[in-house]
UniProtKB/Swiss-Prot annotation:
Main enzyme class: hydrolase
Organism lineage string: Eukaryota, Metazoa, Chordata, Craniata, Vertebrata
UniProt function note: Hydrolyzes ADP-ribose (ADPR) to AMP and ribose 5'-phosphate.
Gene name of the record: Nudt9
Protein name: ADP-ribose pyrophosphatase, mitochondrial
Pfam families according to UniProt: NUDIX
């Protein structure tokens, strides 16, 4: 999602390595037991890759964090070639653009002050009051009083749209069910022969891209509470419901979110909002409704930051926001669900 030198730390996101070490296969359409809080090694492999100091940059990594214009603005980042992403690569002429959005500088509750303010003394790499400033990827370096993005250069300094200096923690609930026919039978893909998994997707209002419903962890809030709250707000429009409706939604969500689940990913995210000094980290968790009965009793309704919400078939054709497609692929692999019509691609992983 302080001061020790990090290497290139390009977010190469070596999920193929993670998948090779943790993916559990089962026969097609057979329910896969989901032990609570599994998949820790997935986060380990990616975290180790980011923090390793490797000098090699892959063209398909750390891309969204270098895109221009910066979201919600006309600001163009300084261009960062693949071979110069990593901090270990010397680049004396590196001249990133400085940008922090007006909405952040206005000083809302969710945002830090400017580093230059005399009364602001953040405790980086540790819990700072109610604000979690520790990274899920390990220690990050501080340079000239500012945290340095562990994944490398982005062409932009400041915070952009992000409120916190350093890691900005989010939570992404991935709610899944099996696609079924009118008789209630699971539907298999005609090519792969595997059952088709569906997940709840929202269309973001800010950029129009489809995404996993999720959001920022409030100060002092537990991840489990964030996961449930964000799903209720964005996929069920709970903020606009009456007290009685909210209680009913809460009861049904409790049944779903208190069951066995899979922690799919924890750590840095290649996100278009990232800067050299502020970046997104997330914990993506899969809650699976095996029978479909729980979600059948909940009506999807877009709310808060979501413009639309719907069930989406999972496949490699999905085009999703930030790193969400990678998270969804991990879920498909773990559930032994359909992902690709290319059997070779299925066996290779990402």
């Amino acid at each position: 999602m302080a001061g020790r030198s990090l290497g290139q730390a390009v977010a190469t996101v070596s999920l193929s390595v993670a998948l090779a070490s943790v993916t559990v296969r089962s026969s097609a359409c057979r329910a896969v037991p989901a032990p609570r809080n599994t998949f820790p090694t997935c986060g380990f492999h990616l975290n180790a890759n980011i923090m390793s100091g490797s000098n090699g940059a892959k063209e398909n990594s750390h891309n969204k964090a270098r895109t221009s214009p910066y979201p919600g603005s006309k600001v163009e980042r300084s261009q960062v070639p693949n071979e110069k992403v990593g901090w270990l690569v010397e680049w004396q002429d590196y001249n990133p653009v400085e940008y922090t959005a007006v909405s952040v500088l206005a000083g809302p509750q969710w945002a830090d002050p400017q580093i230059s303010e005399s009364n602001f003394s953040p405790k980086f790499n540790e819990k700072d009051g109610h604000v979690e400033r520790k990274s899920q990827n390990g220690l990050y370096e501080i340079e000239n009083g500012r945290p340095r993005n562990p994944a490398g250069r982005t062409g932009l300094v400041g915070r952009g749209l992000l409120g916190r200096w350093g890691p900005n923690h989010a939570a992404d609930p991935i709610i899944t069910r099996w696609k079924r026919d009118e008789s209630g039978n699971k539907i298999t893909h005609p090519v792969s022969g595997k059952c088709i998994l569906q997940f709840v997707a929202i269309k973001r209002k800010d950029c129009g891209e489809w995404a996993i419903p999720g959001g920022m962890v409030d100060p002092g809030e537990k991840i489990s509470a964030t996961l449930k709250r964000e799903f209720g707000e964005e996929a069920l429009n709970s903020l606009q419901k009456s007290s009685a409706e909210k209680r009913e939604i809460e009861e049904k969500l409790h049944a779903l979110f208190s069951q066995e689940h899979l922690v799919i990913y924890k750590g840095y995210v290649d996100d278009p909002r990232n800067t050299d000094n502020a970046w997104m980290e997330t914990e993506a968790v899969n809650y699976h409704d095996e029978t479909g009965e729980t979600m059948d009793n909940l009506t999807l309704e877009a709310g808060d930051d979501a413009g639309k919400v719907k069930w989406v078939d999972i496949s490699d054709q999905l085009k999703l926001y930030a790193s969400h497609s990678q998270f969804i692929k991990l879920v498909a692999e773990k559930r032994d669900a359909h992902w690709s019509e290319d059997h070779a691609a299925d066996s290779r992983g990402l």
